Curated annotation (Swiss-Prot):
GO terms for molecular function: G protein-coupled receptor activity. InterPro entries: 7TM_GPCR_serpentine_rcpt_Sra. GO terms for cellular component: membrane. It is a multi-pass membrane protein. The chain crosses the membrane at residues 23-43, 59-79, 108-125, 142-162, 188-208, 240-260, 276-296. Pfam families: 7TM_GPCR_Sra. It comes from Caenorhabditis elegans. One of its GO terms (biological process) is sensory perception of chemical stimulus. This is Serpentine receptor class alpha-31. The keyword Transmembrane applies. It is found in: Membrane.
Length: 338
């Protein structure tokens, strides 16, 4: 939403200084502050408990760090908006931001958005390659490729979106793109949702395939190491599926709600429309849930791995016990015959 002139309407000025909008800023900042504490616990969990495969673990660290940077950019944008509303709230010609004032925050905000989605794609291919245990996949080589992919690709996408942008317009918040780039920006967002939706479905296909494969190994393979690796892959794939599902759910829900609100904007006053749309920050919620998922899945995997190891050990003891009984029965039979 870009406004061509420096001075906005009285309705938008009242909206930007309304208690509804201020409550929105406080809510988002509260989400960010809570996420900081959760992120600290999630990093400790990942660092101390080496329960994920090395490449998956590296990608999860990159996702957490990106989430922190994204929240910093959002916090900066929101705090600047609150400050502008408090200081220039009575002047409708000073309350807006010129797009050129938002270059750092907005580009950081868009970069972390794209990085997060590309990280989900990297996690998907990480789990896909892990299906074949005979490959030399478990090396640092692949994690470097994934990190380069999700770190460099956003620069090319952002260049295509903004290379011909004009930053002379005015916006209510620095999270809004310039008007000259808004069409390409929305096209990229729409394409991103379709791509993530596709990988969302494919990730569950991998999970169910992994589950079927793991069940087959249980019944046909008696090597403890093979069975353990198969079970470890299954647990890691399930965690990745949940992370991808959470991001796509948050993004699709907020994007769909924004589209619905925009479709009825003629019948909704700006005092309700703009604050409602400001709540629709899908990646903020997704990055809030990410450390929660990592903490929960880490604890769950630790418990399930412990139970699985215990079960395998019991099975080995059970088999050893009956093997010894069979041996003693055969020896006693020989003694009796002699």
């Amino acid at each position: 939403m870009e406004i061509p002139g420096k001075c906005t309407s009285e309705e938008i000025r009242l909206t930007l200084t309304s208690s509804f909008m201020m409550g929105n800023h406080c809510f988002i900042l509260l989400i960010i502050i809570s996420s900081v504490f959760l992120t600290v616990f999630a990093i400790r969990k990942l660092w101390k408990n080496n329960i994920f495969p090395n490449c998956t673990r590296t990608l999860l660290f990159s996702a957490i760090i990106n989430g922190v940077v994204h929240h910093w950019s959002i916090a900066g944008i929101r705090i600047r908006t609150v400050y502008r509303a408090l200081v220039y709230g009575s002047d409708r010609c000073s309350i807006l931001f010129q797009s050129s004032e938002c270059l750092i925050e907005s580009n950081l905000y868009y970069y972390t958005n794209l990085f997060s989605s590309l990280c989900c794609i990297s996690l998907f291919f990480d789990r896909l390659l892990s299906l074949n245990a005979k490959t030399s996949y478990n090396t640092k080589h692949f994690s470097k490729i994934f990190l380069l992919f999700q770190s460099i690709s956003p620069f090319g996408i952002l260049y295509w979106i903004f290379y011909d942008s004009v930053y002379t317009g005015f916006v209510p918040m620095c999270s809004y793109p310039p008007a000259t780039s808004s069409l390409k920006f929305h096209k990229v967002n729409e394409f991103r949702l379709y791509i993530l939706g596709t990988f969302f479905v494919l990730s569950f296909v991998i999970f169910f395939y992994n589950r079927t494969q793991e069940k087959g190994i249980i019944h046909n393979v008696y090597d403890t190491e093979s069975r353990y690796k198969s079970y470890e892959n299954l647990l890691a794939t399930r965690a990745v599926c949940i992370i991808i599902a959470t991001q796509i759910t948050c993004l699709v829900t907020t994007a769909s709600t924004t589209e619905i609100l925009s479709a009825y904007k003629s019948s909704i006053p700006n005092t309700i429309l703009l604050p409602s749309i400001a709540f629709m920050t899908g990646l903020t919620y997704s990055n809030f849930f990410l450390p929660i998922i990592i903490i929960y899945q880490t604890n769950r995997i630790i418990n399930q791995r412990y139970n699985a190891i215990k079960r395998i050990q019991n099975e080995k003891s059970f088999a050893t016990h009956f093997a010894s009984l069979d041996l003693s029965w055969k020896s006693s039979k020989i003694d009796n015959s002699s």
